[in-house]
Amino acid sequence: MAGATMSRDTDRAAVYAAEDQWSAALNRGGVIDFFGSRLQLPVQTRFGSLPAVQQYVESLQAMYPDIPPVSARHRRGDTRAHYSNGVIAIPMAATWACRESVLLHEFAHHLNSGSCEGAQSSQPAHGPRFRVLMVALVGRAQTPESSLLLRSCFESKGLVVPAHVD
């Protein structure tokens, strides 16, 4: 779909807020009370070098062998991480950015980019398709419990997470 225009990304702030809640729980890991049930959460990995980030990205890539490759690079500044055209840019000097939750978020952008289907996506960058891909990715890369918590964090912010990708 050449020339597709990106839809307005109205859910970005709510997605970031939901992921901040989820990431804070992963910083601690361990057992949490989840509406009367006990969930065992992993402690999220923190990365100290670009080669470690790249190795993790490659482990995610191995879960999706039919999609185009993605690489990681250092990004100057410390205000945000970024995904564009098969490249995840991480400000390595910013400790907040060197976390597993950030890499999962940026890799989900790769899955949502449209390049995985050979076309440019016209979906909002943080819309329902992104969220369902992110939840599924977390279930594969981490645990079903972590995925359930992320889905609940999205829903607590009023964000729809579809049952599957259309």
Where are these regions (language model features)?
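Active-site recognition of the HExxH zinc-binding catalytic motif
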Residues: 101-114
